[in-house]
Amino acid sequence: MPAQRMRSVIPPYMLRALLTRYAPQRDCALHTLNHVQSLLGNKPLRSPTEKNARAGERSAISTTPERHPTARQTGAQGGAAQQPRRAVDEAYDHLGVTYDFFWQAYRRNSVDNKGLPLVQRALRQGLPEQLSGTASRWCSETATARSSTVSPSPSTLVGHELTHGSDRERSRLIYYQQSGALNESLSDVFGSLVKQFHLQQTADKADWLIGAGLLAKGIKGKGLRSMSAPGTAYDDPLLGKDPQPASMKDYIQTKEDNGGVHLNSGIPNRAFYLAATVLGGFAGKKPVTSGMTRCATKRCRKTPTSDHLRPRHGETRAGLRTKRGDKVQQAWASGWQWSNETAADAQSGYGH
């Protein structure tokens, strides 16, 4: 299973729900689902400016999905945005927030610590209206730290997609089954941390939502995913109910979505949320975040098909070095909630 894949922040199961529940948007949902699936099978495009990057370099681009992302550049590079279009301006601003977060929190020069240019495309072709009131589409090209959107562009999603670029260069987690779910969780974690950094929120004040505000008006939901309570992000007749499990005892075995990478990412997401709130303060600077990062950069580099047990133990050890180590360990344990049957099933065929 190749490690370098394009990602889509909109999980395929949401698009499939629209295909079966909402006839007026069926064609749009099918077109988008086919596009997402084609991205999962393609190699990412390389950035023409990647080799000559300046610190903090970023660009926002307006284009169509069929064209090369640099075909029409309407945002500025390295300075103030010059294009008044809201979509491009917001995209450009969020790239700056993401760069500032990685620099101020971890002293990393861009997501790869090598000054990788941050490129974002504003695509003029939409998702079904139930997924966005402004008909936006999200995808990413992780080799060059690229992501795509049309306004609004929540900072969690920008941080999420750009982190995939860091995942590829640092952890090389296989985008499949448990290691793929961990890959998605790492991006959700840092996407949420970028938002918390931007809003200056402590762990107890953050909403821990991925894609808050992305759902259209009238849809019963808060966002695409909830890190604090997986499975509760939305419950709507058109989208169905958020299917994410919150613990390993509810782990989902499936061949869809690269083995359920967007589904089972809710498990490490909730464990991280519980540990971060126990530690308190700004989650981006806490030992639990460092533990998760170390897992991605060192332990998981050696085992790119890593199962969930490895990051769990690694992050627990990081928490034990704090004054609240016992409480952090308890938080992780309550987040994972293994059952004997699920443990045997989930570990078969993975990891080693």
Curated annotation (Swiss-Prot):
GO terms for cellular component: extracellular region. Optimum pH is 8.0. It is found in: Secreted. It is an enzyme of class 3 (hydrolase). Keywords: Hydrolase, Metal-binding, Metalloprotease, Protease, Secreted, Signal, Zinc, Zymogen. It holds the Pfam family Peptidase_M4_C. InterPro entries: Metalloprotease_M4 (IPR052759), Peptidase_M4 (IPR023612), Peptidase_M4/M1_CTD_sf (IPR027268), Peptidase_M4_C_domain (IPR001570), Protealysin_N_PP (IPR032475). Residues 71-85, 144-156 have a biased composition (Low complexity). The active site is at E161, H262 (proton donor). GO terms for molecular function: metal ion binding; metalloendopeptidase activity. Residues 48-57, 304-325 have a biased composition (Basic and acidic residues). Its cofactor is Zn(2+). Zn(2+) binds at H160, H164, E184. Binds 1 zinc ion. Optimum temperature is 50 degrees Celsius. Coiled coil: none annotated. Its EC number is 3.4.24.-. GO terms for biological process: proteolysis. Residues 41-86, 144-164, 303-325 are annotated as: Disordered. It comes from the Bacteria. Belongs to the peptidase M4 family. This is Extracellular minor metalloprotease. It comes from Serratia marcescens (strain ATCC 21074 / E-15). The lineage of its organism: Bacteria, Pseudomonadati, Pseudomonadota, Gammaproteobacteria, Enterobacterales. The gene is smp.
